[in-house]
């Protein structure tokens, strides 16, 4: 995959020699500071919904970026890995320029004050938001990938195709995932897509079915906007709605921490030893500020097992050599948005998303690593994402000791075996160690009809902390 148009892989273009740590006064920064949003996104918006309802097309209509990049994705015309794209949203300052026409989105390389493109308007536009889109796959077998993307979302666009009945299986499953992760109901926007394929009367009936579907769900407050992503119809109304999504109150002064959702080896085949670049980690900063030249640690890092099956973790330590938000080179990166971090880590350890789910932090300031967790679990009343006429089959059965589940902790994905069940509390032995904090939410999936299906969620109470071995060098 080419790194030229890749917002995360672009981070590899930084220098390979040691660099001095940048000094930043974090007390003067906010998520909407002009000097921040001019260079990097500070809010993550996910696109969710059933397969082929227009998630990637909507991101392309807003940002101009094609998120489907890999050969197998292009051949099958579906999203398989998490897609990502940045966009700047501007508003015309001419009071005679009416909404939503006064809103316009551009790629993240756009200048600070472009001229308004509405015919007859000579006003200038001001930057309102800089947004990262997390484009999730809609196929049922890729639900685990969707949950990884949901871990970094601040808001969401729920795509529902107007030419199909509502709800489709993954529409409900993705909406439940938003509720589990805890996305604010005010930060969800419903897009009734493919309006160019239906009559007005059909669109109105479909809109009523959407309203009925979202009653009592986390999307109950969401506005419903009719759009056509292919024709870019009503996209100005969508970006106006995105401007109503406020960035979270990030803690800029806390110890920096970033969850990794993609990682790359950006070296071309046949590159000489002198040309090799370190691995690139892509993800979203949760708190604090990362700076070029800073010493960082990636946990859990290298995981080994002895003859008795006891796990040992060796966190990876490195220095940040570059920070990128798409083509924008950064000296420091703040929470929100998707950031590419160029490091000196062996690229073989980063290729093919091998750092997925790991956490980057200052040295010695990372989260605890668990091999077993105890969590308070809440099961869904019925199975989502499955078409069935049998009500008994659709009900979610109780958890039993010895059962194997698929567990999403933050962006990490691992198997888990239930070792104890007591009331609503469950102990789960993890197949591979994972970073988490007490109180963190987890998603649980059970294997049903050869697919992992979302069955519930939980809150981490405690766990057996993993013994670590830190590389003395």
Swiss-Prot record:
What Pfam families has UniProt attached to this entry?
Answer: eIF2_C, GTP_EFTU, GTP_EFTU_D2
Its principal location? cytoplasm
UniProt-annotated stretches for the region G1: 49-56
Q: Where is this region: G5?
A: 228-230
- Can you name one GO molecular function term for this protein? GTPase activity
Spans traversing the lipid bilayer: none
Instruction: Give a GO biological-process term.
Output: formation of translation preinitiation complex
Q: Which reaction does it catalyse?
A: GTP + H2O = GDP + phosphate + H(+)
> How is the quaternary structure described?
Eukaryotic translation initiation factor 2 eIF2 is a heterotrimeric complex composed of an alpha, a beta and a gamma subunit. The factors eIF-1, eIF-2, eIF-3, TIF5/eIF-5 and methionyl-tRNAi form a multifactor complex (MFC) that may bind to the 40S ribosome.
Kindly provide the name given to this protein in its UniProt entry. Eukaryotic translation initiation factor 2 subunit gamma
Source taxonomy: Eukaryota, Fungi, Dikarya, Basidiomycota, Agaricomycotina
